[in-house]
């Protein structure tokens, strides 16, 4: 069975997913598209040679008889309504982050999915599909380094645009760490604090950069995450886990080691899409396979809610300078196991 997918949102990430659905992945095809800009939808159909209906409204895509699953890559504030509509129609939905722009919105999706009685939602957190993170989790889960005590992490971008704001360091950047570190450790966060080092002169006047986020988990693991979005030298993701008996470190992407002109060097990536391109392929293939097999296994609506609650606390901590509690609702039995 070839899964027939409707895509809502034909911007950069939407077209990137259309490309991989059309040219890279197996078991699915795009049969319907929508974008707030009709020309973008038409351009996507032409560019990728789609045999797809263009709909004027995203909710029409959800309701379309030919659509068996939905891909939501539209503007963030629209995600909640489209995901809820997909659940109401009983259709599996892959939603790019954010699942909703508030934790309350994520909880409404959780409640709707629980009421439906079957997992239909996968959230577009791709790092758990990165082979480096998977290898790191295997080491942690094996017990080889003992119980994790501390994590030292960094999320560095070469530069960001003028529209990037201080809170986006949490909602657009740290959000990936909030998801993947919770997945690595298998436990929720208890508190968050944000501190500000000396500001780089490469940052816009309105932007606090860098920032250091200090997290504590329910069991007491301490995590520090450096967010530095104007580091200049490249795109660099680091994660070191300090355990009771050893240390495990996220591997850097493979690169040719060069010795030349009395120097030794390794190239550093500058594009975040290049760094995680394989992960995007694997996560969407996992969604396709999960739908076809009748069991989704990727990041769930509950994971989207957990990330949103933690992000809200981090934004509060940015403003207060205090240690902010991260208080989540009780996890429904539906999402356990």
Swiss-Prot record:
InterPro entries in alphabetical order: Gfo-Idh-MocA_inositol_DH (IPR050424), Gfo/Idh/MocA-like_OxRdtase_C (IPR004104), Gfo/Idh/MocA-like_OxRdtase_N (IPR000683), MI/DCI_dehydrogenase (IPR023794), NAD(P)-bd_dom_sf (IPR036291)
Record carries keyword Isomerase: no
Pfam families: GFO_IDH_MocA, GFO_IDH_MocA_C
GO molecular function: inositol 2-dehydrogenase (NAD+) activity; nucleotide binding
Cystine crosslinks: none
Protein keywords: NAD, Oxidoreductase
Catalytic activity: myo-inositol + NAD(+) = scyllo-inosose + NADH + H(+)
Biological process, per Gene Ontology: inositol catabolic process
Enzyme Commission number(s) from the entry: 1.1.1.18
Enzyme class: oxidoreductase
HAMAP family recorded: IolG
Family: Belongs to the Gfo/Idh/MocA family.
Oligomer status and interactors: Homotetramer.
Function: Involved in the oxidation of myo-inositol (MI) to 2-keto-myo-inositol (2KMI or 2-inosose).
Protein name as annotated: Inositol 2-dehydrogenase
Origin species: Burkholderia orbicola (strain MC0-3)
